[in-house]
């Protein structure tokens, strides 16, 4: 099977479907995150998005202010709908990086920087800029992914 889109990867690599679960991925990376129905532990800006989104492109994602004092409301899905989760909001550059596997390690091959002019639209970037691939120290479990 030729893997072009996320739905192809879902079918081709069932052992790695956890990667499509963005809540699980966020928690594995140590981010402050939780599912709809679980209150935040810190007041601040969060990204709210579907737990699963095989369409990609940030569909359904939006920036939202969440407050620890909204505990009861959040427990009753007043701010986060079922099937969605919240995760701490990150600032800084947005990279899209292609990796290749070399000697059982994932190394960056190509990269672009996505430019947003506003946080109001998380689906599309205003433009992309090709850059030299940045190097990030990936968690050990990432290198165990063998596709």
Give short role names for the model-derived ranges.
Residues 143-147:
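Long, well-ordered mid-to-C-terminal structural blocks that present hydrophobic/aromatic surfaces
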Residues 7-142:
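Active-site nucleotide/adenylate-binding loops and adjacent lid/helix of ATP-dependent enzymes
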Residues 1-6:
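General N-terminal leader/first-domain-start detector
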